[in-house]
Regions:
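Glycine-rich, aromatic-bearing surface loops/beta-hairpins
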Residues: 116-141
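Short coil/turn segments at secondary-structure boundaries
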Residues: 26-30, 46-50, 88-94, 108-111, ...
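A short structural micro-motif
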Residues: 36, 53-54, 99, 113-120, ...
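Core of compact, soluble alpha-helical bundle domains
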Residues: 2-65
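Alpha-helix N-cap/helix-initiation sites
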Residues: 6, 23-27, 70, 86, ...
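Short alpha-helical scaffolding segments that buttress acidic/His motifs in well-ordered protein cores
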Residues: 13, 33, 37, 72-77, ...
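Heme-based O2/NO sensor domains and their adjacent alpha-helical segments
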Residues: 39, 43-98
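Short, mixed-charge aromatic SLiMs
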Residues: 96-106, 134-141
Length: 141
């Protein structure tokens, strides 16, 4: 399992942003990230300066949204849907996207379910409950 550090994630998004701005060739993963970066222009400043990005504190106490976490969740959901893992996520996602008339809105709803699943797992010390996650998405669809 690939487990990048916080700095690795921030470097990845900043480098993707830089390459996009310079119109350089992107890796397949960077191309997916670029698509989500373009849908969140409000975060462009966060990705434009690697040193500032590495030093930034997005803790809950500061009340600012974490653009790196947000985009990471978009990437995670896109990957889950592409391989239908956990099983059923693709169908639940498609149903939700149809209901909301858009993939982006569906991603944001799924983020709530994904965040809740991860929080529950951390709180309980148990593995993430994929079935509960899918049920959450299906309820929103």
């Amino acid at each position: 399992m690939f487990t990048p550090s916080q700095d690795d994630v921030r470097r990845f998004f900043c480098e993707t942003h830089r390459k996009q701005e310079a119109r350089e060739i992107l890796t397949p993963l960077e191309a997916i990230a670029r698509d989500w970066l373009l849908q969140h222009p409000e975060y462009a400043r966060d990705f434009s300066d690697i040193d500032r990005a590495l030093a930034a504190d997005y803790s809950v106490e500061h009340g600012a949204p974490n653009p790196f976490l947000h985009l990471s969740m978009h990437l995670s959901i896109a990957e889950q849907v592409s391989i239908d893992q956990p099983p059923g996520i693709k169908a639940a996602y498609l149903a939700l996207a149809r209901r909301l008339d858009g993939e982006h809105a569906a991603h944001h709803q799924i983020m709530e379910c994904l965040g809740d699943m991860l929080w529950q797992s951390q709180r309980s010390g148990l593995p993430p409950d994929g079935a509960a996650y899918i049920d959450c998405v299906r309820r929103r669809a």
